[in-house]
From Swiss-Prot:
Domain PpiC: residue ranges: 177-278, 287-386
Annotated spans, Disordered: 431-454
Subcellular localization(s) per the UniProt record: Periplasm
Main location: periplasm
Protein name as it appears in the record: Chaperone SurA
GO molecular function: peptide binding; peptidyl-prolyl cis-trans isomerase activity; unfolded protein binding
Domain of life: Bacteria
Record comment regarding domains: The PPIase activity resides only in the second parvulin domain. The N-terminal region and the C-terminal tail are necessary and sufficient for the chaperone activity of SurA. The PPIase activity is dispensable for SurA to function as a chaperone. The N-terminal region and the C-terminal tail are also required for porin recognition.
EC number: 5.2.1.8
GO BP field: Gram-negative-bacterium-type cell outer membrane assembly; protein folding; protein stabilization
Primary enzyme class: isomerase
Length: 454
């Protein structure tokens, strides 16, 4: 009897072990790798989660859903490009601390007229995991800092470019006359496309234009066909001045009517199709000058990035407790040019400082101290002393022209840079079937996933 019980127990144990193994194998089979991207991977569970998120967003905006094979291709491509950028940011030591993350989430909540707690509950009602959301925001901030270091901070606008631009505008306020809201579809070509590849892209673009003019909704066409990063948002570029639009598109947009769809527009990145969604006039703008000072702590071989930030936090506490900003700047700032003046940078115009510094400065009230702000130069503690508005027409136009030329160059260079890093990365797509959402079957008759295998 005892032997029988022992054997029975051993048999049940073996069954239990077999069940665990089978469960693990099934679980591993479900959560398989769908793409290898340089040193990282994208899992099917991540792809399914992102596809579900996009589907919820499209349903909320009442956009029609494309076939799963099309949506999966778009979402996976975006995830691949994001993965490349995140890996680059990690290799460059770009980090997003918890304070920056909390501030970003708070700003997102404010834009939705919610408190942070209300916003968190709202995400839960939408089925969005809060931890996943935080990871996504952290990644977006890191990628933004990466692009700023690789693109924004490398762009310089010369006085001659500003003068030439104003001359082309007739030296008047024409730059401020109108803003345009555009829909955009990109049919991409490889960086060194062959004549045959260019021809096929043009033919594809012509087919898209034909469908649009036959009544296809632009948002649906963007989701289905566009290679642009905004494709899943329906290709809406938002409101832009003519000078903020890449030059190859701006030349066409200026003559378009409301609701009009352009013919394909050639650029180094492929063929662009734009739709004039709306246009509006712009009122008179004024130039805001800011009197600002800062303390810079630059990391080095001895002082780590985190130590530099903590040193600034300690200095901020001392200032809030009554210590003099100027004296601390003279004794601690690594910006020797301004340190001898108590950290004073004088009056600065828009566009004069690197973007992360300027964005933080613009968010401050007069006499308010910033939290530590990271730029390519190190960590900054910033204080705005005073602001002035100028209505000097010539000065306003020059600064507006400089700002708009900068935005145009950023857009053009970002498109090329994203294509470059995508082309140079090692990417192996292992998607041999369209992953359906839990409980969903792929609709019959959809395009085979092989159409987007590469």
């Amino acid at each position: 009897m005892k032997i029988s019980s022992f054997r029975k127990g051993r048999w049940l144990g073996a069954l239990a072990l077999f069940a665990v193994v089978c469960w693990s194998m099934a679980d591993a089979a479900v959560d398989r790798i769908v793409a290898v991207v340089d040193d990282g991977v994208i899992l099917e569970s991540e792809l399914v989660r992102k596809v579900d998120e996009i589907k919820r967003s499209l349903r909320a905006s009442r956009a029609s859903l494309p076939p799963d094979s099309v949506l999966v291709r778009q979402v996976l491509e975006r995830m691949i490009v994001d993965k490349i950028q995140i890996q680059m940011a990690e290799k460059m030591g770009i980090q997003v601390d918890d304070d920056t993350l909390r501030m970003a989430v708070s700003q997102i909540a404010q834009r939705n007229n919610l408190t942070p707690d209300q916003f968190r509950r709202s995400l839960a009602r939408e089925g969005i995991d809060y931890g996943d959301f935080l990871d996504q925001v952290r990644s977006e901030i890191a990628m933004g800092r990466l692009r700023a270091s690789q693109i924004n901070n490398q762009i310089k606008i010369s006085d001659r470019e500003v003068e030439h631009y104003l001359e082309a505008q007739g030296g008047s306020g024409a730059v401020a006359d109108r803003e345009y809201r555009l829909g955009h579809i990109l049919i991409a070509t490889p960086r060194e496309a062959s004549p045959d590849e260019v021809k096929k892209a043009r033919e594809r673009a012509d087919r898209v234009v034909k469908e649009l003019k036959a009544g296809l909704d632009f948002k649906d066409a963007s989701i289905r066909y566009s290679d642009d990063p905004q494709a899943l948002e329906g290709g809406d570029l938002g409101w832009r001045k003519l000078s903020e639009i890449p030059s190859h598109i701006a030349e066409v947009v200026g003559g378009m009517k409301d609701g009009e769809v352009s013919d394909p527009i050639r650029s180094p990145g492929g063929y662009h199709i734009v739709k004039m969604l709306a246009m509006r006039g712009v009122g008179e703008a004024k130039l805001t000058k800011t009197h600002v000072r800062h303390i810079l702590i630059r990391p080095n071989e001895v002082l780590s990035d985190e130590d530099a930030k903590n040193k600034l936090l300690a200095l901020k506490t001392r200032i809030e407790n009554g210590d003099d900003f100027a004296e601390l700047a003279r004794g601690h700032s690594d910006d020797k040019g301004s340190a001898i003046k108590g950290g004073d940078l004088g009056w600065v115009k828009p566009g004069a400082l690197v973007p992360p510094f300027e964005e933080a400065m613009n968010a401050l009230d007069e006499n308010q101290l910033s939290d530590p702000v990271q730029t390519q130069f190190g960590w900054h503690l910033i204080q705005v002393l005073e602001r002035q508005e100028s209505s000097d027409t010539n000065e306003v136009l020059k600064n507006r022209a400089r700002d708009e030329l900068f935005k145009r160059k950023v857009d053009e260079e970002t498109e090329l840079w994203l294509r470059k890093i995508r082309d140079e990365a090692y990417v192996e797509i292992r998607l041999d079937e369209t992953p359906a959402s839990p409980g969903e079957d792929a609709p019959a008759g959809e395009d085979s996933p092989e159409t987007f295998m590469r």
